[in-house]
Structures are given as C-alpha cells and as structure tokens.
C-alpha cells in the first residue's frame, strides 16, 4: 500500500464518524472586531434588514451551569415569539432518548469550528408575551421561563437539574441576525452580531448543512471565507462564552 493509499485509508469516513447520530451540522467562524464593519458593508447588512433579538442567560457568578455543560437562555425576539432554551453539551447522540424528537423545539446537532466539533442537545419552548421583561425586572422568578418538559429534558440528558434560586440574570445581549446568499458559497449564510453594554462586539458567520455534506461543507466554507478575505478570529471564542464571562465578572465585582 503506497503512502497516498495509507493516508486515504486513515482519513476515510473521519468526519462522518465524528458526527454520527446528529441531525445537522452548523459550521461557525468568529470574525474579529476589526473585520466586522467590512463584513456588514460587503453584504449590506443593516438594522433595517435584520432580525433583532435580546438574549439573556441565567447562571451563577461562577458559571456553575456553564462549567457543568448546561446553558439556560431566554430570547426576546422583536416582532416574533419569545422563547427559552435549555442545552446540554457535549452529548453522545445514541444516548439521547428518541422520545424527545416529538418536540418541535428539540435539536440534536453538532457545531464545528477551528477548535473542533461539539455535539449538543437542546429543547426550546415558547414563553408568554412580556414574561422575559417581568423576570428581568424581578417581578417573576427565573423558573417561570422554563417548562416542566425542559426540566425533565436536562434530567434525562445530563442527569442534572437546575436550582433556579441560585441563578442570576446575565445580559441582555443585543443581537442582530441576517440570512443571505453569496454566489461563491453554495450554502445559505447566517451572520449574527452580538453587542454587550460595554460596546464590545462579536460577529459569527455560519452555515448549516446535512451531515452527509459535512466534509465538503467544512472545507468549502473555510475556502470561501479565505477567498473573500474574511479573516478568522484566532481566539475563536464562542458567543456564549464571550457573553457569560463578561456578565459573570460584573456580578462578582458587585458582590465584593
């Protein structure tokens, strides 16, 4: 067996094995702040053609949930249905009970970035109009944002539960979201810009693809970004970590 054949045998099915059991793959790239304005201008992305969201996370000042692999989040979406999400990662797909697939808000997917592939399971449920604002104002408890199904989901997937009495509100993040197409990219592109109250920004560009297209999509999307001159953020922070660490720092400082 020659060298090329050995190399091919070693890598054959490598991506497919990493993604076994998930329904879809989202390939994400973080754009550094000094490239954000150029990206917005290139695709004419403005606050007039976006989907605007306000995102709140719920965790302890020490980010105990996040450290344990759990995320509790609520989104106020301008002009659309508000919702809340519980997510657990990483997961082993074949250990996730199939009974959760009956829920429209269930997702079993993988996120791919320069740092690797992470599989997650999440359950999103609608929330009542105005409920998020009431919780943030302290008029309702955080627990009111999450359903019994979401509680059962975390217990089933992560063998854990959330003590809402120990959680604080982290946020809001103001988010702008766009979907658009580029002739050079065969996949529909999503851009999301998050803004913190201190003025810091983080932009993520992503595509979603069926698992069967994963290997081609990963290589193709990275090649597309290089071709259009989109510089990747070498830190490759996830939006969630970037937001949580900032607001958790603020909480800890208030307690000093």
Segments the model singles out, each with a brief description of its role:
Residues 2-256:
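Phosphate-end processing signature that detects enzymes handling 5′-triphosphorylated RNA
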